[in-house]
From Swiss-Prot:
Protein species of origin: Ostreid herpesvirus 1 (isolate France)
Protein name per Swiss-Prot or TrEMBL: Uncharacterized protein ORF17
Length: 115
């Protein structure tokens, strides 16, 4: 089973399961914050996974990620910014994208340039 197939299957099950949205948010936070592979091919694949998961998170239920003073449009905007930072992580210097999503403050780092 390929990584892509496994990831897609896992995401589908997470979305369909109770509390799946929280799981997707957690997974995207982990994947987007760390570069876990060292080869160029793996980094390229990881970048696509990051953008796919970040996009999925912003599309699933934008209002789910808004809380306190955050309104839906602001949550959507932040998610879109995160998505493009993940997508262009190796090209654009996107060291800090701070967003209050899922009730937590997350920091996305471009670890690839630091290695």
């Amino acid at each position: 089973m390929s990584y892509e197939h496994a990831a897609s299957t896992s995401i589908i099950f997470l979305i369909l399961s109770p509390g799946g949205r929280k799981c997707v948010c957690f997974i995207s936070r982990v994947v987007c914050s760390k570069s876990m592979f060292s080869t160029l091919l793996s980094k390229t694949l990881l970048r696509f996974f990051k953008s796919y998961i970040c996009l999925l998170r912003s599309v699933i239920s934008p209002e789910y990620f808004s809380f306190n003073s955050f309104n839906s449009s602001r949550a959507i905007t932040i998610s879109i910014v995160e998505f493009f930072c993940c997508l262009l992580g190796g090209i654009v210097s996107c060291y800090e994208v701070k967003a209050e999503l899922c009730g937590i403050f997350i920091l996305l780092n471009n670890d690839e340039e630091n290695q």
